[in-house]
């Protein structure tokens, strides 16, 4: 079985930084919910194409993925764990803006499996 990683680009930011060259848009809650639903749908649609690989890393990049709520991230992670072969020692990483993150939010991310 092949091993690989999963990169999920979360294009949302609280504000657009002038130095950033990555694709991003400013945070709009209705857009984020629709985006998360589309990611989950895409994971389900591609289940058969993802079967021959074990995934040992999941990386949420962006944008600023930490603008997503714990529930939104948990929804994505549940879809991945339910439809992909995930290594039991998976590394799950999430980019955060240090000026916008709190200990409470980091603790909640840890509770849903982001390590």
Predicted regions and their residues:
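Canonical Radical SAM [4Fe-4S] cluster-binding loop centered on the CxxxCxxC motif
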Residues: 2-34, 112
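Generic detector of well-ordered alpha-helical packing
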Residues: 10, 22, 43, 96-98
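A short, N-terminal amphipathic alpha-helix
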Residues: 39-51
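Short acidic/polar active-site loop segments enriched in Thr and Asp
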Residues: 4, 53-56, 90, 115
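Conserved glycine-rich "GG(E/T)P / GGGxP" loop and the immediately following alpha-helix
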Residues: 26, 48-83, 92-108
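A short alpha->loop->secondary-structure connector
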Residues: 86
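Hydrophobic alpha-helical membrane-association signature
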Residues: 35-39, 76
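Acidic (Asp/Glu)-rich catalytic clusters
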Residues: 108-114
